Amino acid sequence: MSVSLIASDQFRIVVGLGKSGMSLVRFLASRGIAFAVADTREQPPELETLRRDYPQVEVRCGELDVDFLCRANELYVSPGLALATPALQQAAARGVKLSGDIELFARHAKAPIVAISGSNAKSTVTTLVGEMAAKAGKRVAVGGNLGTPALDLLADDIELYVLELSSFQLETTDQLNAEVATVLNISEDHMDRYSGLPAYHLAKHRIFRGARQVVVNRQDALSRPLPVEGRPCWTFGLNPPDFKAFGLREVDGEKYLAFEFQTLMPARELKVRGAHNQSNALAALALGHAAGLPFEPMLEALREFGGLAHRCQWVRERNGVNWYDDSKATNVGAALAAIEGLGADIEGKLVLIAGGDGKGAEFTALREPVKRFCRAVVLLGRDAERLAEALGDAVPLVRVKTLDDAVQQCAELAQAGDAVLLSPACASLDMFKNFEERGRLFAQAAGGLA
């Protein structure tokens, strides 16, 4: 049996049958809303699941049919599909609303939302805030762009939602109405999808629509919403904090995480290393504080947090050299954070592995930090030559074809006291299934060194 295609206020089409698309299917079906599914791919990832669990739902695969899309009054568009897709634009011109799973989630969520975006660190900070809330005894649900799709989190007993949100998800979100929202930082990313940094910036800042409180990185002007008047604004940064601010204070030669003029805990008690991880901890404290969490359980969560996989994750020590997997550094900003954060935290130098699919980004910002902190850079992947041009003669450059070759070169180049860092500044899809596979293979190769 096929879903009726009679246009009505209750007919929707889910465009894109991946993880978030399948969560939309479950949500709409559970509420008895008539819908169909479309996907530009002939074999979308969740097609078998849809046909098994919802055989009555009509699904169209392949090129999008505008007339078909216009039979609905609202399209829920997958984050992976650009809104500039001609068929979507034509449907919108004919009066069809373009929306997404986060907009639908916001309409139905009954508990406060902590909303987190940014070019980098959003998964780490989202996880931290979730763990802080759990330590505080809250019934908390964590997800969005990280882990569980937002719609699958909806439940009547939840006391707090903590969501990681991408710019792609925010493009289809008109009014999130978060209790507290933040853009942790902004640097070039997804320039293959956006016309430039201003368009990317605008997409990120949709997170602030309807937010009752905001958290701002005071060391990144692009993270500040305009205007902030009329709602509480908390800040975080690596400099000393003042009113309504979290930061670092030095007391008797030791650095402390601090709120206003109150020291909270020594920075050395964090298990994760580097200034960027101190910044992440301060951001999480600011968000948790804005959401009403007490300091004691938040600090306990910080002391226990060992970091996420593929985010400056320690792999092994060999001959006095530590190896780190930062495969999640899929853009320049993330790689900069790792190079500067880890580089300042070790005795020796970094031997960096970089390269992959640069997504149209500009790499010149890497030159000075690489010159300061790196002994050498091993390059691989599609944009290795673009990286080489940007780095120039800052340090010796070695070009390789495979990740195994990169690991072998690093083993030869690194000296005792150094660290080998996989922080590619690029996406992985030119050579690997995803950044997780890239990180696993790096750790496997490093672990196999005699």
UniProtKB/Swiss-Prot annotation:
Catalyzed reactions per annotation: UDP-N-acetyl-alpha-D-muramoyl-L-alanine + D-glutamate + ATP = UDP-N-acetyl-alpha-D-muramoyl-L-alanyl-D-glutamate + ADP + phosphate + H(+)
Record flagged with keyword Ligase: yes
Biological processes per GO annotation: cell division; cell wall organization; peptidoglycan biosynthetic process; regulation of cell shape
Pfam families: Mur_ligase_C, Mur_ligase_M, MurD-like_N
Keywords associated with the record: ATP-binding, Cell cycle, Cell division, Cell shape, Cell wall biogenesis/degradation, Cytoplasm, Ligase, Nucleotide-binding, Peptidoglycan synthesis
Record-linked InterPro entries: Mur-like_cat_sf (IPR036565), Mur_ligase_C (IPR004101), Mur_ligase_C_dom_sf (IPR036615), Mur_ligase_cen (IPR013221), MurD (IPR005762)
Coiled coil: none
Disulfide-linked positions: none
Protein family (similarity comment): Belongs to the MurCDEF family.
Entries under HAMAP family matching the protein: MurD
Function, in words: Cell wall formation. Catalyzes the addition of glutamate to the nucleotide precursor UDP-N-acetylmuramoyl-L-alanine (UMA).
Name listed for the protein in its UniProt record: UDP-N-acetylmuramoylalanine--D-glutamate ligase
Record organism: Pseudomonas putida (strain ATCC 47054 / DSM 6125 / CFBP 8728 / NCIMB 11950 / KT2440)
